[in-house]
Amino acid sequence: LDRGVYGPRHERIGGAVRALQPDWIFITGDLLNVPEGLPHLFRFLARLREAAPVFVTLGNHDHYSGVPVADYAELADRHKITLLVNQSVFVSTGRGELAIVGVDDPSLHRADLHCVPPQADHRFTLLLAHAPNILDQVKAHHAIDLILCGHSHGGQWQVPGIPTFWLPPGCNGRVAGRYE
């Protein structure tokens, strides 16, 4: 919520998400820029929650907003949104278990991978992190199957035919796409 206000655009986004009938919704931070937007943010997340369980991590702008993590956590709990700040939750899928791991923003050096559970049979481990520099911290023993990140905005600014010339700190050259 860049301007901190919930509006018709957010209703349209919520409607489009609900129409997709997702099983889960994952958001990797940069939810908020100004503290005045906090109630509007959770109104939006609650609308998304009508479609599917919502799992959220924090990004650099969430911290820059000045809102304490405890305030995010209290509102997330109240609205049944799963806020993961260096934490893991487990979801039964009927074919096994999904471990959803969320770390605090790696670009601000707040990520702690000690929350990644050990490898287990019939478990798929998904890591949610705001910045792609989390890839520099992940090791083979972490047994993570998929990492979802944001922060790079797909290259921030791009001119057709010219390689990306600026990325936010914390991307470490990763613009968009798949990295192994």
Predicted regions and their residues:
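Short amphipathic alpha-helix with an adjacent loop that forms part of the alpha/beta core around
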Residues: G14-A19, V91-S92, A111-A120
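Active-site-proximal beta-strand elements of phosphoester/diester hydrolases
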Residues: L1-D2, E97-P106, L126-H130
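Membrane-embedded segments
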Residues: L1-T82
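Short loop/edge segments at beta-strand edges and connector loops
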Residues: L58, V85-Q87, A129
